């Protein structure tokens, strides 16, 4: 479960390393985001010379979440960290590579570009 003020790791090569959630999209008063949900983030740490700079505000999609999520078949999926992929205005990833596994829920939410770039889909 991701909420406002949650610190997250960036799982792409856009230049950002750490971000903080400042808004959860999906209706007035929505409190938590899970796998495949869009959030608004601010960049807290970035590499020099990257596409994204510190203090920049951008959209992101959650690709790994530490809180377990129940699937339709009754199984649960859980990761060791909370991670996001940064998105541009069109909803496409800003980076050209994805690091680490991503959840299968992204395929259901139509993030095919992220799924195709990911080294592993769980």
UniProtKB/Swiss-Prot annotation:
GO terms for biological process: translation. InterPro entries: Ribosomal_uL14 (IPR000218), Ribosomal_uL14_bac-type (IPR005745), Ribosomal_uL14_CS (IPR019972), Ribosomal_uL14_sf (IPR036853). It holds the Pfam family Ribosomal_L14. GO terms for cellular component: cytosolic large ribosomal subunit. The keyword Zinc does not apply. Belongs to the universal ribosomal protein uL14 family. This is Large ribosomal subunit protein uL14. The gene is rplN.
